[in-house]
Amino acid sequence: ESGNSCYIYHGVSGICKASCAEDEKAMAGMGVCEGHLCCYKTPW
């Protein structure tokens, strides 16, 4: 199940999910995610 893509900042985007994996960061409160978390990984 994949959700909407969510944009964090330049060069970093994630996927809206109900819960994030252990190696992912989570950003809450993004409108595009409709109450879910935006799960993303930073490239560094």
Curated annotation (Swiss-Prot):
Functional description taken from the UniProt entry: Specific pancreatic alpha-amylase (AMY2A) inhibitor. The recombinant peptide inhibits human pancreatic (Ki=0.01 nM) and porcine pancreatic alpha-amylases (Ki=0.1 nM).
Protein's recorded name: Alpha-amylase inhibitor helianthamide
Keywords from the named record: Alpha-amylase inhibitor, Disulfide bond, Pharmaceutical, Secreted
Localization per record: Secreted
GO CC, one annotated term: extracellular region
Annotated disulfide bonds: C6-C38, C16-C33, C20-C39
GO terms, molecular function: alpha-amylase inhibitor activity
Free-text comment about domains: Is structurally homologous to beta-defensins.
Organism: Stichodactyla helianthus (Sun anemone)
Family label: Belongs to the sea anemone alpha-amylase inhibitor family.
Superkingdom of the source species: Eukaryota
Region entry Inhibitory motif, spans: 7-10
Keyword Nucleotide-binding (UniProt): no
